[in-house]
């Protein structure tokens, strides 16, 4: 006699592989899937999960943000390798780049050049796997997910100060009722 289960043919909601067809990403997934299985390290499981994520969920992080987070006295991150599953971008507002050790999925050309010029090192995630197979002496960071322009529009409602989708940015558009006291009310 069989058991009648309510949940028939229900797919798991989380990703089990990246949606991207990028062969280099697939090789990294293969590597970190092996490491996550064979080592008892939560670091490798976290890296693997982030490799599955969509591009919008792998936001970029700037070298100025990395420098600010690693230079904190309380964090005690001296000599540790910063790991980012995403892109490391340059920030021209940062005048002097400190000596950094960064491992990431990809780097912008100028970010890579500035880190290397400062005497730091730039690693790929497969090079990191050889150096720290269990993630020892590393710190995992990620960029701000809600920094995208699209997030200005999400969650619309009263008193939320969300940006409306407008057909034009001119004086006559979305500037009247609800935006000025003289036109009924101001939110």
UniProtKB/Swiss-Prot annotation:
The lineage of its organism: Eukaryota, Fungi, Dikarya, Ascomycota, Taphrinomycotina. Gene3D superfamilies: 3.100.10.10. There are 2 genes for eL18 in S.pombe. Belongs to the eukaryotic ribosomal protein eL18 family. The modification Phosphoserine is found at residue 136. It comes from Schizosaccharomyces pombe (strain 972 / ATCC 24843) (Fission yeast). Component of the large ribosomal subunit (LSU). Mature yeast ribosomes consist of a small (40S) and a large (60S) subunit. The 40S small subunit contains 1 molecule of ribosomal RNA (18S rRNA) and at least 33 different proteins. The large 60S subunit contains 3 rRNA molecules (25S, 5.8S and 5S rRNA) and at least 46 different proteins. eL18 interacts with NAP1. The gene is rpl1802. PANTHER family: 60S RIBOSOMAL PROTEIN L18, LARGE RIBOSOMAL SUBUNIT PROTEIN EL18. Component of the ribosome, a large ribonucleoprotein complex responsible for the synthesis of proteins in the cell. The small ribosomal subunit (SSU) binds messenger RNAs (mRNAs) and translates the encoded message by selecting cognate aminoacyl-transfer RNA (tRNA) molecules. The large subunit (LSU) contains the ribosomal catalytic site termed the peptidyl transferase center (PTC), which catalyzes the formation of peptide bonds, thereby polymerizing the amino acids delivered by tRNAs into a polypeptide chain. One of its GO terms (cellular component) is preribosome. PROSITE patterns: RIBOSOMAL_L18E (PS01106). InterPro entries: Ribosomal_eL18, Ribosomal_eL18/eL18-A/B/_CS, Ribosomal_uL15/eL18, Ribosomal_uL15/eL18_sf. It comes from the Eukaryota. Keywords: Cytoplasm, Phosphoprotein, Ribonucleoprotein, Ribosomal protein. The modification Phosphothreonine is found at residue 134. One of its GO terms (biological process) is cytoplasmic translation. It is found in: Cytoplasm. GO terms for molecular function: RNA binding; structural constituent of ribosome. This is Large ribosomal subunit protein eL18B.
């Amino acid at each position: 006699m069989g058991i009648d289960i309510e949940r028939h043919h229900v797919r798991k909601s989380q990703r089990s592989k990246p949606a991207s067809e990028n062969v280099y990403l697939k090789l990294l997934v293969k590597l970190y899937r092996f490491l996550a299985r064979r080592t008892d390290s939560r670091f490798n499981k976290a890296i693997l999960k982030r490799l599955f994520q969509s591009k919008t969920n792998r936001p970029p992080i700037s070298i100025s943000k990395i420098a600010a987070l690693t230079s904190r006295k309380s964090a005690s991150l001296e000599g540790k390798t910063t790991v980012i599953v995403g892109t490391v971008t340059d920030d021209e507002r940062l005048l002097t780049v400190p000596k950094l050790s960064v491992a990431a999925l990809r780097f912008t050309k100028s970010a890579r050049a500035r880190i290397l010029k400062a005497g730091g090192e730039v690693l790929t995630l497969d090079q990191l796997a050889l150096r720290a197979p269990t993630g020892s002496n590393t710190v995992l960071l990620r960029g701000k997910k809600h920094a995208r322009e699209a997030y200005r529009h999400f969650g619309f409602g009263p008193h939320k100060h969300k940006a409306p989708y407008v057909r034009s940015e001119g004086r006559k558009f979305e500037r009247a009722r609800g935006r000025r006291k003289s036109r009924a009310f101001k939110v």
